[in-house]
Amino acid sequence: LDLTLAAARLEAFGQLQRLFLACGGVAAAATDFAERWRTLALFVDRRTERVDAAAFFGRNPVRGVKCAVLFDREAEGLTGAELLWLAAADSDPRRDVTVVGEVVVVDARSKRPGVEGHPARFPNVAVASSATVERVDARWAEYGLGETMASPSERYRRLLLSDKAAW
């Protein structure tokens, strides 16, 4: 499958998305970055402990892809900037980068403490409480910051792994 040609021919992201078959623990793939950066975002259910990227690429042969980043399924739908932030925050090159064939695979999924060399404590995503978001929204004009903008906390809430700072 040549992603550059497929992206040019298919109008909707959903059509391109359906070209990939779930396999090796990968539940979904996003090709938003394939043409420009030769990168795939691969989404994995949190219950999946090990991802077999070789099986995924064996069943979904792609040309031109140089990098694949694994994310928790809950990150699906985040913007490119948000995924970049998540990848930088949730990966350690010494532990989370492998090469499968010609593709660099970065594991940016949330880390389970003590599993596969992960630290005993791992930080949770930081979000403001709903009450705090509502309070800031109600007083936004007082702060003189211009037009009201949506809090990113609402978008990131689905990434929480527990109600504590570390899990």
Roles of regions detected by a PLM:
Residues 1-167:
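Charged, compositionally biased interaction regions
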